Amino acid sequence: MNTASSMGDHATIGRYETFSYLPPLNREEILEQILYILDNGWNASLEHEHPDRAFEYYWPMWKMPFFGEQDPNVILTEIESCRRSYPDHHVRLVGYDTYAQSKGHSFLVHRAR
């Protein structure tokens, strides 16, 4: 009888933010989450960090936050640019709620290998 989980070894794999127990999101699913961030009126931003330092609270920001950006394809293009520039880093998309002054949404869009 095989009792191995199809999700892998949950005890040794680092978990980060929303969706961490799901398989990696594809391009369309990431686009849906970008639309969710924009539909809520939040400002999107990208952060990246090397896996060795991924559990530190602050991650370096990729460029500037996308203040007022309403085109999800612009954000998706920046995600791809960040992935190419830092292939050995985790990349996280953040939706910042300026009214509550906190993160409204945050998840990994790229997990380093």
UniProtKB/Swiss-Prot annotation:
Keywords: Calvin cycle, Carbon dioxide fixation, Photosynthesis. GO terms for molecular function: ribulose-bisphosphate carboxylase activity. RuBisCO catalyzes two reactions: the carboxylation of D-ribulose 1,5-bisphosphate, the primary event in carbon dioxide fixation, as well as the oxidative fragmentation of the pentose substrate. Both reactions occur simultaneously and in competition at the same active site. Although the small subunit is not catalytic it is essential for maximal activity. Heterohexadecamer of 8 large and 8 small subunits. It comes from Allochromatium vinosum (strain ATCC 17899 / DSM 180 / NBRC 103801 / NCIMB 10441 / D) (Chromatium vinosum). This is Ribulose bisphosphate carboxylase small subunit 2. The lineage of its organism: Bacteria, Pseudomonadati, Pseudomonadota, Gammaproteobacteria, Chromatiales. Coiled coil: none annotated. Belongs to the RuBisCO small chain family. GO terms for biological process: reductive pentose-phosphate cycle. Signal peptide: none annotated. It comes from the Bacteria. The basic functional RuBisCO is composed of a large chain homodimer in a 'head-to-tail' conformation. In form I RuBisCO this homodimer is arranged in a barrel-like tetramer with the small subunits forming a tetrameric 'cap' on each end of the 'barrel'.
